Design a protein with these regions (language model features):
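Transmembrane alpha-helices and membrane-interface helical segments
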Residues: 129-134, 172-183, 209-217, 333-336, ...
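Aromatic-enriched
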Residues: 355-446
Length: 446
């Protein structure tokens, strides 16, 4: 894998320099435009780890901020009040990553938050290299591959330079696992996947596929997940907030911020009433209805041929159903109360596990449809979102509507970068086609 990464870095060196320049510009711009609570919070917990160890998992945000003092008690290093003043909900590897990152940078405050963005930007650019390795020639020949690459570029730039979130690290370890799996290094792939899950747990959806590739390699996965057991054994840590998140309890969040969540149709909280109350709102089912209709028309493309399925052994039948499993994974986004817009790309990396181009294209369309129904869900339940989740989300942009000006400039820069990259790719394709034409005519190409 290291050899592949080195070769791909050399091959894409010009584009990497360009993306790094764009990322460096985006870091201070985003820091000025957005209150990056996740980054600030991770910084606070990273510093607190060296004082309190794994017992930080037993402390709420407010308790940690009060114990750490300035600048962590300024209100921007904790999550909003509607999240119930929760404890740290991320698995162990993410905590250790930020603990090391804060240890490498002397002092607190000042440029330390930008330092965290910088590290995440480097990880994001490594992710672009890993994606290029997984796509191989498809990056130059398939339109869906270029669209996915462009989409991940914008997503990764926002998560690293504009959000300071854990997603780039999680994706990096997941992509490493997929590269190692393609190289036949199944044990190492499982170790990387285990670390990815312990950064943010959403990458667990890739575990069944990697397990089917080599069932015996699950041993390495279990060994790598021992990292999570250590806090339990040594510090008595608990992951109550993570469990509450998965159980969809109101203890995690008093708001339902997922506009696709079917529960809004039967129990939408009345945020205007002076006393706690709820009401029925049938339009909240519109996103689910559209998604179900889309899936009913498309899921049969991911089913194996009937004759092939009948003739296969029980194990081969399971393998034949892998595309269907991958296609159904994004449906879990409808099950949780807390789903933010960028969660749509959480399962983007699964696209590399499809062997057929038509399956990958269909999967990309599914993610697009989910993004559409997410937006439609906000409009369908506008009275609820207008009086609660949306104002709280917009509050993270201190400049208000004026934040759109530099934001549009950054989007414009991203479009220009993609245009330059696409232009060079087209020139390479034209050059390659001309060489083939000359060779077919029997001409000598020097």
């Amino acid at each position: 894998m290291l050899r592949s990464i080195s070769f791909k870095i050399y091959e894409m060196r010009r584009y990497l320099i360009l993306t790094l320049v764009v990322s460096m510009i985006a870091i201070p711009v985003a820091d000025y435009l957005v209150i990056q609570r996740d980054r600030n919070r991770n910084e606070m917990y990273g510093e607190a780890f060296w004082i309190y160890g794994f017992s930080v998992y037993e402390m709420t945000d407010s308790e940690v901020a009060e114990a750490m003092g300035p600048p962590f008690n300024d209100g921007t290093h904790i999550l909003p009040p509607y999240l119930g003043n929760i404890t740290y909900e991320y698995p162990v590897f993410g905590l250790i990553f930020f603990a090391i990152a804060t240890w490498l940078y002397p002092g607190v405050g000042g440029l330390q938050p930008l330092w965290l963005n910088f590290i995440l930007v480097l990880v994001f650019n490594l992710n672009l290299i890993l994606i290029a390795i997984l796509l191989r020639d498809k990056l130059y020949t398939e339109r869906w591959a270029r669209l996915f690459f462009a989409g991940y570029f914008i997503y990764g730039l926002i998560m690293s330079a504009g959000g300071g979130k854990l997603e780039p690290i999680t994706d990096c370890l997941l992509l490493m696992a997929l590269v190692l799996n393609k190289e036949g290094q199944n044990g190492k792939a499982m170790v990387a996947l285990g670390l990815s899950i312990q950064t943010k747990i959403y990458s667990v959806v890739a575990l069944p596929i990697l397990f089917l590739s080599s069932p015996i390699s699950i041993i390495w996965f279990l060994l790598s997940t021992m990292l999570t057991v250590i806090p339990f054994m040594v510090g008595g840590a608990r992951f109550d907030s993570l469990i509450q998140h998965f159980l969809n309890t109101s203890d995690y969040s008093t708001y339902i911020v997922n506009p696709m969540y079917p529960g809004l149709a039967f129990d939408t909280t009345n945020l205007i009433a002076s006393e706690p109350a709820s009401y029925i709102w049938p339009p909240a089912l519109i996103p689910l209805a559209i998604y179900v209709g889309f899936m009913l028309f498309t899921f049969d493309r991911y089913l194996p041929e009937k004759e092939e399925f009948r003739a296969a052994s029980w194990w081969d039948r399971i393998l034949l159903l892998k595309p269907l499993y991958l296609y159904m994974v994004p449906a879990v986004l409808f099950l949780f109360r807390w789903v933010m817009p960028w969660y749509l790309f959480w399962f983007g990396g699964l696209i590399f596990l499809f062997k057929k181009n038509e399956h990958a294209i269909g999967y990309l369309k599914e993610i697009t449809i989910i993004g559409f129904v997410y937006t439609l869900g906000i409009l369908a339940n506008w009275p609820y979102f207008y009086h609660g989740p949306l104002p709280d989300f917009v509050a993270n942009f201190p400049l208000g509507i004026f934040s759109l000006v530099p934001l549009m400039l950054m989007i414009g820069v991203c479009i220009i970068v993609f245009g330059l990259w696409r232009w060079t790719i087209n020139k390479q394709e034209e050059h390659t086609m001309k060489i083939r034409e000359f060779e077919e005519r029997g001409e000598l190409v020097i």
